[in-house]
Structure formats: C-alpha cells, structure tokens
Design a protein with these regions (language model features):
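Polar low-complexity intrinsically disordered regions
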Residues: 1, 18-23
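Small-residue-enriched, tightly packed secondary-structure blocks
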Residues: 24-183
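Bacterial N-terminal signal peptides
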Residues: 9-19
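Bacterial N-terminal signal peptides that target proteins for export
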Residues: 1-10
Length: 183
C-alpha cells in the first residue's frame, strides 16, 4: 500500500517532540542567584569588555542554563533572573519554538542586555519578543566589540554543551515576575 505524501510529515511531527531534550520542554532548568553570579563572572572572564556592557545597561536577564533541541520542530526553555542596574528585581522564563531544518540538542547560557528604561519596561510587561531577525552574539574573547543593540536589546550566548545543526526560523518570548509578588 502506498501512503500519501503527507503521512511522513505527520509522523515526523508526532515523533519530533520525543527527541527534544526534557530541559527544553519541561518546566525548564531552575536557576538560583549564586549560579547567575557565576555565569556573569564567566562571561566577564571570557570577554573583559562585557564588564562595561553590564555596568552601562539599564537592566539584563541572565539565563544560566537554556536547553534547546529538535528535529524539524524545535524548542528551547530556560529560567533566570532579571537585574536593574545590578540589583535583582525579578525572575524570568525564556521560551522558544522553531521550525525548519534542525537536528540535535544543545545547552547554553544566555544574557539579554536591556539598554534603556524603555527596553527594560517592555521586558517587564512581557512585550519583549525576539523575532527571527534578532541575532545573538556567541561569547568569544571580543564579543563585546560585536555587540549591537536592536530596539534596545542585545543578546550574548555561551555554549555549555551539545551539538545542533540548524537553519530554522523562530523567536524567543520572555515572561517576567517581580521578586516578592505572589501572583
């Protein structure tokens, strides 16, 4: 019996979620402020120029561990903390869904720099959604030199492990909860 063309696509869509790392689709890796401090230290050690970026930014969100994976359909998720001028103000969750050619899984750390009060306010109100055109700078010895803000936002990532091949389209969405809020 010959199957119609769309059956393989349906089968792939059903099987793909089972291949995504559990960190990417579960509630996400948890983070604590001491882990965030260690990640910030690693970022600054790798590129000392980032110390000025941290100091000059109105705010930043640090996600110590983001899990990402997929086969055709992909997802990423991580939990972190949000700072305003170096002071802890809230928690955040990063969520990403992608579609396109992708195979594998990886784990990385991510810092989202918020240049000014407007960018920080958008983040806190849940209005910050990074589209496919937003690009992250991979942490190297001179990442700060390549860092460019787009709509008041810049992203730096540092690989922790894994291997991922991708030419996919998707965006990141962030949630925010102020420290001390119960709802």
């Amino acid at each position: 019996m010959k199957l119609p063309f769309h059956y393989p696509a349906v089968l792939l869509a059903l099987l793909a979620p089972s291949s995504i790392p559990s960190a990417a689709i579960s509630s996400g890796p948890t983070a604590d402020p001491s882990e965030v401090a260690a990640v910030i230290k690693k970022f600054k050690e790798k590129d000392p120029g980032l110390a000025k970026v941290f100091a000059d930014a109105q705010g930043y969100a640090v996600f110590p561990t983001v899990g990402k994976g997929g086969i055709g359909l992909g997802a990423a998720r991580g939990k972190g903390y949000v700072y305003q001028r170096g002071r802890l103000i809230g928690r955040s969750t990063l969520t990403q869904v992608t579609i396109g050619f992708q195979l594998g899984g990886q784990v990385y750390s991510e810092v989202v720099f918020l240049k000014d009060a407007a960018a920080l306010d958008n983040f806190k109100r849940g209005r910050l959604k990074l589209d496919a055109q937003a690009s992250a700078v991979a942490l190297t010895a001179r990442a700060s030199a390549d860092l460019a803000y787009r709509n008041g936002v810049a992203i730096v990532t540092m690989a922790k492990g894994g291997l991922m091949y991708e030419a996919s389209v998707g965006g990141q969405k962030f949630s925010y909860k102020a420290i001390g809020k119960t709802s």
